[in-house]
């Protein structure tokens, strides 16, 4: 059973425990309807994947909770909570539907925070916070960095960390970005084995590649995508300026 399948069962139990009507509507809007300005505002850098269309932000609303999740498969979904609890988790789009809904539900229950992406100058502030956080909690580790989060990569590189970065975007692979070489995501497992710690986008949980990071090293997830899953499964997570 995958982590998301287990989460689906747990979410069904949460719904039952709260006596929710299984026919209650969940509205999900893909980031095609969230402009880059709505999703991330006007950050100081222009190389975020949200700004160049390589990733999109899916947003789910349940009652007063709003949850977001990155995906590379945008689309629309409108259905009931029961539909989400029984959705087949066989594509990145459907997994993103489930994860963003989980985030919205957990936020509605006030069981998690930072389920909405930071905006404007906040991504830069987040990145500036990261090196000190790593030093305080892990010293000066070798870091496998999964996903292209340019401000974070730049901050860690400038701070002198031994860093190996992987990405799935062919436009980045083999290039020097943010002062460091960008490797193919097919090397995730090798880099996780090499590193002392892994810093990973929560998108690996949506695209179902998280298992390759399990190399006996601490895995710390960053960002909004993993908000609900981190709370549900006690996964280490950082999201300094999420809303």
Task: Please report, for each region that a protein language model flagged, where it lies by residue.
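An anion/phosphate-binding loop that grips the pyrophosphate of nucleotide cofactors and donors
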Residues: 195
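Short, hydrophobic beta-strand segments that form beta-sheet elements in well-ordered domains
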Residues: 143-147, 162-167, 199-200, 218-223
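Short, acidic/turn-prone active-site loops that include or flank metal/cofactor-
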Residues: 167-171, 186-188, 223-228, 243
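Short acidic low-complexity segments
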Residues: 182-192
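C-terminal functional extensions of proteins
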Residues: 208-243
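Histidine/lysine/aspartate-rich catalytic loop segments that bind and position anionic ligands
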Residues: 148-182
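Electropositive, gly/pro-rich neighborhoods at or near active sites that engage anionic ligands
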Residues: 1-150
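A short SAM/SAH-binding and catalytic strip from SAM-dependent methyltransferases
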Residues: 201-205
């Amino acid at each position: 059973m995958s982590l998301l399948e287990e989460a689906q069962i747990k979410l069904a139990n949460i719904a039952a425990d709260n006596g929710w009507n299984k026919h209650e509507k969940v509205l999900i809007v893909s980031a095609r309807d969230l402009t880059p300005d709505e999703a991330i505002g006007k950050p100081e850098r222009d190389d975020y994947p949200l700004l160049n269309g390589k990733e999109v932000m899916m947003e789910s609303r349940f009652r007063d909770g709003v949850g977001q999740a990155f995906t590379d498969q945008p689309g629309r979904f409108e259905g009931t909570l029961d539909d989400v609890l029984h959705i087949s988790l066989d594509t990145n789009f459907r997994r993103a539907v489930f994860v963003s809904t989980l985030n919205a539900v957990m936020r509605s229950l006030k069981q998690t925070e930072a389920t909405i992406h930071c905006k404007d100058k906040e991504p830069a502030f987040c990145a500036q916070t990261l090196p000190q956080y790593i030093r305080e909690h892990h010293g000066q580790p070798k870091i496998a960095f999964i996903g292209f989060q340019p401000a974070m990569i730049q901050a860690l590189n400038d701070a002198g960390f031994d860093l190996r970065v992987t990405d799935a975007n062919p436009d980045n692979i083999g290039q020097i970005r943010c002062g460091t070489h960008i490797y193919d995501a097919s090397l995730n497992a090798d880099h996780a084995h090499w590193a002392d710690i892994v810093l990973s986008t929560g998108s690996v949980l949506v695209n179902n590649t998280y298992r390759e990071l399990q190399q006996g090293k601490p895995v710390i997830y960053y960002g909004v995508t993993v908000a609900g899953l981190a709370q549900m499964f006690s996964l280490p997570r950082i999201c300094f300026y999420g809303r």
